[in-house]
Amino acid sequence: MLIQRGGLKVVAGLGISGVSAVNFLHEQGYQVAVTDSRPTPPGHDQIPAGVKTSFGQLDQELLLQAEEIILSPGLAPQLPEIQAAIAKGISVVGDIQLLRRATDVPIVAITGSNAKSTVTTLIGLMAKDAGKKVAVGGNLGRPALDLLKDQPELLVLELSSFQLETTSHLNAEVAVVLNMSEDHLDRHGNMLGYHQAKHRIFQGAKKVVFNRDDALSRPLVPDTTPMQSFGLNAPDLNQYGVLRDADGTLWLARGLQRLIKSSDLYIQGMHNVANALACLALGEAIGLPMESMLETLKQFKGLEHRCEYVKTVHDVRYYNDSKGTNVGATLAAIDGLGAAIEVKKGKVALILGGQGKGQDFGPLRSSIEKYAKVVVLIGEDAPVIEQAIQGATKILHAATLKEAVELCQRETQAEDVVLLSPACASFDMFKSYNDRGQQFVACVNSLV
């Protein structure tokens, strides 16, 4: 029999992190209850015996009995049931806050509108290859509290704005906001609310990494906090950036020291150069040896559906960036690949479209004008996108992804690239962005 500790902990919202929080608190000997608005929420069968459950609606009465509410990231703190508890002085936190209380293991904390998963995975591999006992998760892969079972000496966490909303004083060893562009405004109200949520990652951080190409990523932290920047320009002393030789060779560099040629990376595109530089800065902050980090970097193949190289057909390279579900991600992909192939006079054939989530597609216009020879539009918001980019380049329409890929093949020649980076959600035509990416790969593989 577990000895009950403290007052009642109520987990609001199940799902992956909710189940993880319920089990963690139960194992710690707390009195736990869980409520979810869904009649049979995912993970309901993984709740230990002795935990009170209330499903079908958020149980206001139960929430008001709580000493503390653990809110799942999918639920907004603005919900009336949660606001009523806050008004009564009940503490509302998330699983990341529980993690911070439970351990003093150093945390590498990563957020940003785009590239979070790539950077989180890569810095995790760098730490592992350098001999660290590291656990990687959070918003990516395993829920944060489950990572403690590994008894790691280092935690690498990808954190979403939703997770950061309920996190205070994370006290990370090093924290970074990789970039900021419009996303989740339906939840945060406006860009300011989104920015404030993201920047909670810096509370109590011992060291900070920021993107000097993106003013919104730079934190307001005490002058005494060590800060290191990365960017796609020549770096100052002890900062990370790029240096270009007279013959056009591009180097990733720290100050004046050339570290590795961009052509030696498997992951291509300038946005991936930025991701690699961010990882080198994060790795330096936690004391990883440079030689080991560069070796990991050379081997890293990138993640599925994130500017993933598929194959070359008739000297045209095909890239699957199905995870590009917002304008910022697609901009990074167009600019990244466009700049990389410009030297050889290559151009981008871009497949765009899906469910636009009310975004403004106007910011895509100048990059499309500069790098794209054709845009093929698919999905329900094709007319909205067409209006925003009209006149920037040639625009074609396709009823299916297969037709879109075939049109791109027809429009391209040697040194060009075909890029699926829809800037939209996938649910109008596909089960998920994974499904969309897999179908794209299948279409490319069937080209002759």
Swiss-Prot record:
Annotated residues for binding of ATP: G112, S113, N114, A115, K116, S117, T118
Catalytic activity: UDP-N-acetyl-alpha-D-muramoyl-L-alanine + D-glutamate + ATP = UDP-N-acetyl-alpha-D-muramoyl-L-alanyl-D-glutamate + ADP + phosphate + H(+)
EC number of this enzyme: 6.3.2.9
MF term (GO), any: UDP-N-acetylmuramoylalanine-D-glutamate ligase activity
Alphabetically ordered keywords of this record: ATP-binding, Cell cycle, Cell division, Cell shape, Cell wall biogenesis/degradation, Cytoplasm, Ligase, Nucleotide-binding, Peptidoglycan synthesis
Keyword Transmembrane helix: no
Domain of life: Bacteria
Gene Ontology cellular-component annotations: cytoplasm
UniProt xrefs under Pfam families: Mur_ligase_C, Mur_ligase_M, MurD-like_N
Pathway this chain belongs to: Cell wall biogenesis; peptidoglycan biosynthesis
Gene Ontology biological-process annotations: cell division; cell wall organization; peptidoglycan biosynthetic process; regulation of cell shape
Main location as per UniProt: cytoplasm
Recorded family membership: Belongs to the MurCDEF family.
Function: Cell wall formation. Catalyzes the addition of glutamate to the nucleotide precursor UDP-N-acetylmuramoyl-L-alanine (UMA).
Name recorded for this polypeptide: UDP-N-acetylmuramoylalanine--D-glutamate ligase
Lineage of the organism: Bacteria, Pseudomonadati, Pseudomonadota, Gammaproteobacteria, Moraxellales
Gene name linked to the record: murD
